[in-house]
Every structure is written in C-alpha cells, then in structure tokens.
Amino acid sequence: GITGNRDKILKQFSGGKNSILLGASSFWEGIDLPESALELLIITRLPFDSPDEIMNRAHNKLLQQQGKNPFYHSELPKATMRLRQGIGRLLRTEDDHGVAVVLDPRLQTRRYGKTTLSSLPPDLPINSKKTAELISITQKFLQNGKEGKVN
C-alpha cells in the first residue's frame, strides 16, 4: 500500500490503472478525479460528524438551548451535503459514469434515510439491492461502461 499525505496518495492513485483508493474523511472534499479515474465509489457509512468532538458538543448544546434538535438542524444536513459531495466526485461531467454504493443500512432503516436519498440529483438512479445482486450489477456496469444499465 501507499501511505503519505492526501496529495501524494491522490497522485499515485490517479497515475495507476485499476487502482483502489481507501480514503477517510479528508477525501470527501476538494478532490477532482475526472473521467475514468473514478468509476466505483463505495461509501461504508453516512458521513456524520463524531458527536464526541468538542466543537460538535458545544454546537449541539447551543442548538438544544435554542430549543432545536441538533440532529435534524445540524448533523443530518451536514452529512447529507457530504454524501452529495462524495457522489459528486464520481459524476463531475456529462461524460463521467460510475456506480456509487452506500453500505450504510440507515438509508433504508431510519426515517431520515428517505429524506437523504431525495436530496440526491433527481436523474440519479437509486436502487436497493442485496450484496450478491449488487456485485453482479456493478460488474456489468463497469464492463459496459457508460452504456451499462442498473436495474
């Protein structure tokens, strides 16, 4: 594997073929991987901030003092925006194509999941699939390129 700062890792990733990049939160913002540099994006969990970070605790306490629910007024909107940004890395231009897989079951099991999904671009096909089915569909899409269809 390659270690180092984000820019070094991105440079190595961009120069490789059939590369896999495992990235943490620093890869959610400010990167541009055009065309076929990024075709498969796997998001393991929704990008919520840690509620234990001191700034989040202070902000959440302030919201509570104002009678607001910190989750719905702050945490969920930020996570939804980051999810949109992450998927946006996959589809930067009309010529880009790819598959975004979100493994976090909360999109299906929590009330806020439907709202989060509805915030994604309206022309983005969204499907809920079992793992075996997902692997097959993703392989077909990547083999067929832009013309691949996900059902």
Question: Where are the regions a protein language model picked out?
Answer:
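ASCE RecA-like P-loop NTPase motor cores
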Residues: G1-N151
